[in-house]
Amino acid sequence: MAEKESNGVRVCVTGGAGFIGSWLVRKLLEKGYTVHATLRNTGDEAKAGLLRRLVPGAAERLRLFQADLFDAATFAPAIAGCQFVFLVATPFGLDSAGSQYKSTAEAVVDAVHAILRQCEESRTVKRVIHTASVAAASPLLEEEVPASGVGYRDFIDESCWTSLNVDYPLRSAHFDKYILSKLQSEQELLSYNNGESPAFEVVTLPLGLVAGDTVLGRAPETVESAVAPVSRSEPYFGLLRILQQLLGSLPLVHVDDVCDALVFCMERRPSVAGRFLCAAAYPTIHDVVAHYASKFPHLDILKETTEAVATVRPARDRLGELGFKYKYGMEEILDSSVACAARLGSLDASKLGLQKG
């Protein structure tokens, strides 16, 4: 969509102050769109002020709305008048305690129902685009493999759905809760496309591990995980190991490519709907460690354990078939993640041999 076509077009970004949401808000404002961004607390000046300062001179095209996942009706004012709605990922640690819901998954599914209804009632929404997670697209087989007990499909693709009935090494009850919320919310959203007369299209993008850079003042957890072999952070390195066991590889994508893909799906004409995996590279932890060891030979890089994992690649690139192109490969994602972490103080730039700033 040309910039002149974006003039007057209103889009809603839920979770606008988050890692992906803030980058997306900036990109949309730069392209000339009017953005309705939701925050859990518009009185939090650190977050609200950051969004207002993202693009100089664009403040008049940014409206901030207070909305809470556990009170889905609060999203209605932000959605009203918008032609496109971006449902950005739920915060990993969101706590349902004190709400009417038994779990985050229950709250998310209820919010999906409410938001879809609000989009219908708006009579303006043309497309809803959701940042899903590749963690809900595991190629693990339900049948046990005699040698290891764990097996994978030959490829990962959009037909893969994570089964919580399959055990795998390093499985975590905490991570299971996250998977369940992402799994159920994505399936609920996609089911809308199969209704009798849907009022708009739904697109979901199951994202790989999102890293690279941030406009926030701290390194996001996924960036911390991407640089874990360099920082030697065992907890963040543990997330890489869990993902590799779950997925048979470590899908990576740069946050800028994620937001380009989201905008691509919004601007796609005349129609786009359904599920599209979004990852630029599918390395193993061994590949990531090897890159860092080559880049920083003077450092003691945290290495992978000896457990064997099959390397599962994508069967196809459905986004690419539509015309989307990734700008960042594995090396660029990892290198920019290190630079980001060093800039924000999560890594010691002097030890890396980098200039901080």
UniProtKB/Swiss-Prot annotation:
Other notes: Plants susceptible (e.g. cv. Pr, cv. K41, cv. K44 and cv. K61) to the fungus Cochliobolus carbonum race 1 contain a transposon insertion (Drone) in Hm1 and a deletion in Hm2 due to a loss of resistance. However, the compatible cultivar Missouri 21A (cv. MO21A) possesses other defects in Hm1 and Hm2 alleles coming from different mutational events.
Organism: Zea mays (Maize)
Keywords: NADP, Oxidoreductase, Plant defense
Catalytic-site annotation from UniProt: K182
Described function: In tandem with Hm2, NADPH-dependent Helminthosporium carbonum (HC) toxin reductase (HCTR), which inactivates HC toxin, a cyclic tetrapeptide produced by the fungus Cochliobolus carbonum to permit infection and acting as an inhibitor of host histone deacetylases (HDACs), thus conferring resistance against C.carbonum race 1 in resistant cultivars (e.g. cv. B73 and cv. Wisconsin 22). Catalyzes the production of 8-hydroxy derivative of HC-toxin via the reduction of the 8-keto group of 2-amino-9,10-epoxy-8-oxo-decanoic acid, an amino acid of the HC-toxin.
Effect of P146S: In strain: cv. B73
Keyword Oxidoreductase: yes
SUPFAM superfamilies xrefs: NAD(P)-binding Rossmann-fold domains (SSF51735)
Source species, domain of life: Eukaryota
Residues given in the record as NADP(+) binding sites: R40, K47, D68, L69, V88, A89, T90, Y178, K182, L207, G208, L209, V210, T222
Protein name: NADPH HC-toxin reductase 1
EC number: 1.3.1.-
Enzyme class, broadest EC rank: oxidoreductase
Entry's Gene Ontology molecular function annotations: aldo-keto reductase (NADPH) activity; oxidoreductase activity
Pfam families cross-referenced by the UniProt entry: Epimerase (PF01370)
Activity regulation note: Activity is sensitive to heat, dependent on NADPH, and inhibited by p-hydroxymercuribenzoate and disulfiram.
Assigned protein family: Belongs to the NAD(P)-dependent epimerase/dehydratase family.
GO process terms (BP): defense response to fungus; toxin catabolic process
Gene3D superfamilies linked to this entry: NAD(P)-binding Rossmann-like Domain
